[in-house]
Amino acid sequence: MKHIITPYEHTNDTARNNSDCPDVVLPEEIFFTISIIGVLENLIVLLAVVKNKNLQCPMYFFICSLAISDMLGSLYKILENILIMFRNRGYLQPRGNFESTADDIIDCMFILSLLGSIFSLSVIAADRYITIFHALQYHSIVTMRRTIITLTVIWIFCTGSGIAMVIFSHHVPTVLTFTSLFPLMLVFILCLYIHMFLLARSHARKISTLPRANMKGAITLTILLGVFIFCWAPFILHVLLMTFCPNNPYCVCYMSLFQINGMLIMCNAVIDPFIYAFRSPELRDAFKKMFSCHRYQ
């Protein structure tokens, strides 16, 4: 989205001249390499779930949704680099119709990546909550049918929101909507965590009898959430500063780190699959089978 994800170099030149902070420029090869790795890793996660019937359950479907979100974020950067390469070599007319349309599609993928991650983490949090505090009713509450319906609604909403944000990208309310979803997701999950903590204190004996995997899933969610905040929060702050104080020297100084903030987003897609593999023995076994070329039963 041109107004939301326009790089730092489009910031007011006068403001940049008044800042003592030089632009931090990273080679495009770094972005491209990280993005390729992110796509391949998350594709492996998707293939593992598709090919292994033991992994075809609600929890792993939610993880697949998060993997798709991460993959879209990586594809965004790959396609952007390809578009820039074609333009620099004269294959595309600068600011032509094709480039503008391609820009909009690529920007929509970026927004889908953020929105998809937000909602995927939220449903994973809800799933973990039900697993811990409604363990006996879990399979009647979280059915495959409800899981598929939930994910379908989420991605339809994300796609519609992404298209709308691209169309109205130059309006401040759009930026506020884009950035507000991030803290709203954190508030939702924080409320779940507080409720889980309060219930845990009053039902300590009951929770101690739960399977270890249930509690392990909650810890995995905490790690995923921490990585997501660490990787995306700097960029969200960049967008807010670019919108509300683009000429302030301190804001401009922070915005000089744009490419580092962008690299953190790419790293999120690379880190998540390692978390899945490290925390899930089932997924780890599926990876081993894939790489050892064993046939799935």
From Swiss-Prot:
GO MF, any single term: corticotropin receptor activity
Keyword line: Cell membrane, Disulfide bond, G-protein coupled receptor, Glycoprotein, Lipoprotein, Membrane, Palmitate, Receptor, Transducer, Transmembrane, Transmembrane helix, Ubl conjugation
Regions of this protein lying in the Extracellular compartment: 1-23, 80-104, 169-180, 245-256
GO biological process: adenylate cyclase-activating G protein-coupled receptor signaling pathway
Tagged with keyword Ubl conjugation: yes
Glycan attachment positions: 12, 17
Entry's transmembrane regions: 24-49, 59-79, 105-126, 148-168, 181-199, 218-244, 257-278
Signal peptide residue numbers: none
Post-translational modification: Ubiquitinated by MGRN1 that may be involved in post-endocytic trafficking and/or degradation of internalized receptor.
PANTHER family the UniProt entry points to: G-PROTEIN COUPLED RECEPTOR
Protein's job: Hormone receptor primarily expressed in adrenal cortex that plays a key role in regulating adrenocortical function. Upon corticotropin (ACTH) binding, facilitates the release of adrenal glucocorticoids, including cortisol and corticosterone. In addition, MC2R is required for fetal and neonatal adrenal gland development. Mechanistically, activates adenylate cyclase (cAMP), the MAPK cascade as well as the cAMP-dependent protein kinase A pathway leading to steroidogenic factor 1/NR5A1-mediated transcriptional activation.
Name of the molecule in the record: Adrenocorticotropic hormone receptor
Biological source species: Mesocricetus auratus (Golden hamster)
The organism's taxonomic lineage, starting at the top: Eukaryota, Metazoa, Chordata, Craniata, Vertebrata
